[in-house]
C-alpha cells in the first residue's frame, strides 16, 4: 500500500494493500478502494451531498457504500460522491465529478471535467469525452461514445415547478452502441436507439430510432448508419 502522508482516510474506509493514494486525497467512511486502484492528488471519494436549503431536491447526507473497482484510475481533482459504484479498469479524468447514486461500469472513460449527476447509470466500455454534462436520472448503456461539450437535461419545466418530483426529472436513455457528436444537446426523456448516431451540434427534441443518423436544429433523420 502506498498512501501519501497528506492523504486523509477516515475510519470505516477500506483501502486495498496495493492501492496508491497520492497527496491530499480525502477518502470518507463507507468507501471501498479495491486492488490496483490509483487515486491522484486532491481527489475526494465518498463525500456526501449538501444542499444548503437552496434546492428543491432533498438529499441524503449520510455516508453510504462507495466503491472504486479494481485497477481503476481516479485522476487529479476528481470528486466521487457517496453511494456510487465505479467499475473495474475505469478512468476518471482530471476534475471529473460523479454525484451520489451513480453506477459506472467496467472499462469506461469519464474524461476531464465531465460531470455525471445523481442516480445515473452508465454501462461497460462507454466513453464520455471532455467537458460533457450527463444529467441526473439518465441511463447510458454499453459501448456508447459521447463526444466533447455534449449537454443533456432532465427537466422540461426548467425549475419552475413548486417542488421536486423525481418521476418528472428524467434524463435521456442512450442505448447500446450509440454515438453522440461534439456539442450536441439532448433534451429530457429522449431515447436514442441502438447504434444510432447524433451529429455534432444537433439539438435532439425527439426520440432517435436505432441505426439512424440525425443532424440539425432540431435534429432530423438524414440516413441509416453505415
Where are these regions (language model features)?
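Structural signal for interior beta-strand "rungs" in well-ordered beta-sheet cores
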Residues: 2-52, 56-215, 220-221
